[in-house]
């Protein structure tokens, strides 16, 4: 499969042959499994104090008192320790021994990655995610794109190939999160827009654009390509990144 390499002015520089993984079968089931496995590694174990709710001298009265057989405090008839009592232990508290990480076979993980890469050049899947773009995919820039140092230069290059409208879509989608999360460092929700994949680590000019993620081809994973387990993210590649993708 061949693809056009675009200049930063929007013209066509040349044609290149895409790696074989761009022709991989679309497997949404494996993509979902791989993303869940990746997300599970970020979970932290939670547990409660082992003696929470039972640090009390309460004992049951036994039979013959006309009251239920629950532990009661010494200075009265108030129940303690049991889950249904105020200040009592939790019935089924979280335990640190719980296995949080989901496993995935190595070959399944590799196939999910290749499938997510292939989905990034399918216009129907990209449109179904709500992305806005003009022209055809894949979107591949010449390596000069990685040398851009100003955000305005990046905006100009993205406008020239007809994808800046997707960043505007993400910018308009920003809203205050419902619930307690707004008090816990995640006040705003915003839709994902472009994914920019480069060959080098020092491309910082696009990091402040709304919804944009910039990642090197070596650090690229399934979650970058399929946020929310839905494949078909609008992706901008550089020529060197596509070439280095062959070795993944």
Swiss-Prot record:
- Which is one GO molecular function term here? rRNA binding
- Return the annotated region ranges for Disordered: 69-92
* Any single GO CC term annotated in Swiss-Prot or TrEMBL for this entry: ribonucleoprotein complex
User: Looking at the record's lineage, which domain of life comes first?
Assistant: Archaea
Q: Name one Pfam family in it.
A: Ribosomal_L4
A biological process term (GO) from this entry:
translation
Entry keywords, A to Z: Ribonucleoprotein, Ribosomal protein, RNA-binding, rRNA-binding
Name the InterPro entries on file.
Answer: Ribosomal_uL4 (IPR002136), Ribosomal_uL4_dom_sf (IPR023574), Ribosomal_uL4_euk/arch (IPR045240), Ribosomall_uL4-arc (IPR019970)
> Can you state the subunit structure given in the record?
Part of the 50S ribosomal subunit.
Protein family membership = Belongs to the universal ribosomal protein uL4 family.
Q: What does this protein do?
A: One of the primary rRNA binding proteins, this protein initially binds near the 5'-end of the 23S rRNA. It is important during the early stages of 50S assembly. It makes multiple contacts with different domains of the 23S rRNA in the assembled 50S subunit and ribosome.
Please report the name of this protein according to its UniProt entry: Large ribosomal subunit protein uL4
In its UniProt entry, the species of origin is given as Methanoregula boonei (strain DSM 21154 / JCM 14090 / 6A8)
The gene it comes from is rpl4
């Amino acid at each position: 499969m061949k693809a056009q390499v675009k200049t930063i002015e929007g013209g066509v520089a040349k044609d290149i042959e895409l790696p074989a993984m761009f022709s991989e079968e679309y497997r949404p089931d494996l993509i979902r499994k791989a993303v869940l496995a990746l997300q599970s590694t970020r979970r932290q174990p939670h547990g409660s104090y082992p003696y929470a709710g039972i640090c009390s001298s309460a004992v049951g009265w036994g039979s013959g008192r006309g009251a239920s057989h629950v532990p009661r405090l010494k200075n009265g008839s108030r129940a303690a320790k049991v889950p249904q009592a105020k200040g009592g232990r939790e019935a089924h508290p979280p335990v640190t021994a719980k296995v949080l990480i989901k496993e995935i076979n190595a070959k399944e993980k590799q196939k999910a990655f290749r499938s997510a890469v292939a989905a990034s050049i399918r216009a129907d899947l990209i449109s179904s995610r709500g992305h806005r773009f003009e022209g055809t995919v894949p979107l591949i820039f010449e390596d000069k794109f990685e040398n851009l140092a100003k955000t305005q230069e990046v905006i100009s290059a993205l406008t020239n190939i007809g994808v800046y409208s997707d960043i505007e879509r993400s910018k308009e989608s920003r809203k205050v999160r419902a619930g307690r999360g707004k008090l816990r460092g995640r006040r705003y929700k915003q839709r994902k827009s472009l994914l920019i994949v480069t060959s080098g680590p020092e491309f910082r000019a696009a990091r402040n654009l709304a919804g944009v993620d910039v990642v090197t081809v070596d650090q690229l994973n399934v979650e970058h390509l399929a946020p929310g387990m839905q494949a078909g993210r609008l992706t901008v590649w550089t020529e060197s990144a596509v070439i280095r993708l062959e070795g993944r």
